[in-house]
Amino acid sequence: MTAAVTSSNIVLETHESGIKPYFEQKIQETELKIRSKTENVRRLEAQRNALNDKVRFIKDELRLLQEPGSYVGEVIKIVSDKKVLVKVQPEGKYIVDVAKDINVKDLKASQRVCLRSDSYMLHKVLENKADPLVSLMMVEKVPDSTYDMVGGLTKQIKEIKEVIELPVKHPELFESLGIAQPKGVILYGPPGTGKTLLARAVAHHTDCKFIRVSGAELVQKYIGEGSRMVRELFVMAREHAPSIIFMDEIDSIGSTRVEGSGGGDSEVQRTMLELLNQLDGFETSKNIKIIMATNRLDILDPALLRPGRIDRKIEFPPPSVAARAEILRIHSRKMNLTRGINLRKVAEKMNGCSGADVKGVCTEAGMYALRERRIHVTQEDFELAVGKVMNKNQETAISVAKLFK
């Protein structure tokens, strides 16, 4: 009896041990199928959503194609809560109604809008298009130049602060005095005297959008392109106010107009006329300031330099001995100098040099130290650098004297 029970238990255990792995395997296979089906369903749902988006896009395109065409206009002025003055090219200016779904308070001057072809009702607001070349003129990262990095220009820094920085930071002072804010300033002087460096420092301290453009970039091949770029430049400045427009080498488009000029000169004159129009048009309360720089003030058109357009002219003369010594201290303060270097003596030997030449002397002095495998700069390195930068024979004379020491 006991033997029979034992044999039956063995058969049952063997049966269970064979069934359990079988069902476990089936469960795993079923779970894999479920996961596969679930992933397939998700993939099909994603495809369905993508196709639905395409269908909606095509329906919108079809609806737009079936609608009557619209005129593109430019907002000039808001007349009332339901009326807007719009300019349409080439027809003219119209006072039009505004659709109910558009808030008139959101409209701004120079904004592009759509007008219905039948009723001239304003029914859509468009984004202002900008030339990629004009968009690239905006400097996204404000220069890290400060007034401490500008040497020998104490008077010029004070004057440009009064014209550019003070109206931006404290406009209430001009309102209390009852005077108009200055619109712009022109910096003139020989090359390398610090005009661009000071403009970068102003952009850093005023915390404004800095738009830098060279006058040569506004000289275009086709008729009207330069004028259009000037208009878009000031539109971009108004959109990102407060902003500073720095126009370098303004003499390339602002030279004096002469009779009988044609071809490329006439296009340059049209560009300058558009610039004059924009300088007269934009309001000083918009916190848009313009800085111009040139090496040739004598050839600029008097209409560009009159008060009301350019309110101050700041001269950048060649630096004096004291100014050159200060510039040397600024550019050499991070250099590894030996003791006893007399920068004043170095500055006295650089008659007629500009600030850029002084910076070049510091660089050349470091190069002379590298040639002799030294990690410090000596007085003699500066004297050799002065001779090289000033293009004189001092380098040869000093080298010969060094041999007989």
UniProtKB/Swiss-Prot annotation:
Modified how: N-acetylated by NAT1.
GO molecular function, one term: proteasome-activating activity
Coiled coil: none
Signal peptide annotation: none
Residues at which ATP binds: G189, P190, P191, G192, T193, G194, K195, T196
GO cellular component: nucleus; proteasome complex; proteasome regulatory particle, base subcomplex; proteasome storage granule
GO biological process, one term: nonfunctional rRNA decay
UniProt xrefs under SUPFAM superfamilies: P-loop containing nucleoside triphosphate hydrolases
One family name in Pfam for this protein: Prot_ATP_ID_OB_C
Record's keyword terms, sorted: Acetylation, ATP-binding, Cytoplasm, Nucleotide-binding, Nucleus, Proteasome
Subcellular location: Cytoplasm; Nucleus
Modified residues (N-acetylthreonine): T2
Subunit structure: May form a homodimer or a heterodimer with a related family member. Interacts with OLA1, TMA17, and UBR1.
Family per record: Belongs to the AAA ATPase family.
General function of this protein: The 26S proteasome is involved in the ATP-dependent degradation of ubiquitinated proteins. The regulatory (or ATPase) complex confers ATP dependency and substrate specificity to the 26S complex.
PANTHER family: 26S PROTEASOME REGULATORY SUBUNIT
Miscellaneous section: Present with 4700 molecules/cell in log phase SD medium.
Annotated protein name in UniProt: 26S proteasome regulatory subunit 8 homolog
Organism expressing this protein natively: Saccharomyces cerevisiae (strain ATCC 204508 / S288c)
Gene: RPT6
